[in-house]
């Protein structure tokens, strides 16, 4: 009976451990993002409230059709210098393929605005 209680206690402790999706001190912003370019910039990133467990973080992002990411900076709705969270293998999200010249032009404008914001923050 004692061994059962010890095993049950250890099992509860193992499953009840909190999960830090972004343990990297630099890339510590947990975001739900859409497409990106080589993890340099991710688009349409939003902060979502989630429990500190892995499946809820992934599920929260999946509800909006996005993927969990850990980013260095979030400016406007873009995540800069991002990576997949610990324990997560996202599908290839570095496939941003704008349809038409207007979308590409808008994308380049957004990137320019983000870089200006970063420069303003650094000054």
From Swiss-Prot:
<dbReference type="GO" id="GO:0005576">
    <property type="term" value="C:extracellular region"/>
</dbReference>
<feature type="signal peptide">
    <location>
        <begin position="1"/>
        <end position="16"/>
    </location>
</feature>
<keyword id="KW-0732">Signal</keyword>
<comment type="similarity">
    <text>Belongs to the cerato-ulmin hydrophobin family.</text>
</comment>
<dbReference type="InterPro" id="IPR010636">
    <property type="entry name" value="Cerato-ulmin_hydrophobin"/>
</dbReference>
<keyword id="KW-0964">Secreted</keyword>
<keyword id="KW-1015">Disulfide bond</keyword>
<keyword id="KW-0134">Cell wall</keyword>
<dbReference type="InterPro" id="IPR036686">
    <property type="entry name" value="Hydrophobin_sf"/>
</dbReference>
<protein>
    <recommendedName>
        <fullName>Class II hydrophobin 2</fullName>
    </recommendedName>
</protein>
<dbReference type="Pfam" id="PF06766">
    <property type="entry name" value="Hydrophobin_2"/>
</dbReference>
<feature type="disulfide bond">
    <location>
        <begin position="71"/>
        <end position="82"/>
    </location>
</feature>
<feature type="disulfide bond">
    <location>
        <begin position="32"/>
        <end position="61"/>
    </location>
</feature>
<feature type="disulfide bond">
    <location>
        <begin position="33"/>
        <end position="45"/>
    </location>
</feature>
<comment type="function">
    <text>Aerial growth, conidiation, and dispersal of filamentous fungi in the environment rely upon a capability of their secreting small amphipathic proteins called hydrophobins (HPBs) with low sequence identity. Class I can self-assemble into an outermost layer of rodlet bundles on aerial cell surfaces, conferring cellular hydrophobicity that supports fungal growth, development and dispersal; whereas Class II form highly ordered films at water-air interfaces through intermolecular interactions but contribute nothing to the rodlet structure.</text>
</comment>
<feature type="disulfide bond">
    <location>
        <begin position="22"/>
        <end position="70"/>
    </location>
</feature>
<comment type="subunit">
    <text>Homodimer. Homodimers further self-assemble to form highly ordered films at water-air interfaces through intermolecular interactions.</text>
</comment>
């Amino acid at each position: 009976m004692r061994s059962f209680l010890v095993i049950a206690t250890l099992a509860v402790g193992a499953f009840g451990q909190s999960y830090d999706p972004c343990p990297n001190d630099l890339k510590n912003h947990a975001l739900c993002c859409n497409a990106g370019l080589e993890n340099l910039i991710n688009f349409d990133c939003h902060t979502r409230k989630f429990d500190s467990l892995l499946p809820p973080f992934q599920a929260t992002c999946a509800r909006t059709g996005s993927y969990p990411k850990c980013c260095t900076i979030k400016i406007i709705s873009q995540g800069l210098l991002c990576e997949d969270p610990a324990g997560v293998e996202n599908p290839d999200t570095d496939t941003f393929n704008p349809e038409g010249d207007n979308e590409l032009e808008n994308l380049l404008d957004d990137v320019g605005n983000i870089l200006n914001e970063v420069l303003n923050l650094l000054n």
